[in-house]
């Protein structure tokens, strides 16, 4: 599992306020969370939002839940793509 400190170091625009309610996700999802964080960071560089914060990253019902404190269609799209990628990983793991 990725630490909040590590995420803050890599993506300060995304995690500058930490993760309000914590992060609880399986290690197998680290790559997807890092890719999502990278995409959000690049977006925030071009579209600054000083109020942006990640509220929580967790597993729920076998899927990724990545909660943020604001509504942004572009970022929400990135999150949906990451959730689908996790669903695919979980589907493949069940086939093994």
Locations of regions flagged by a protein language model:
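Cys/His-clustered metal-coordination modules, chiefly Zn-binding fingers
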Residues: 76-96
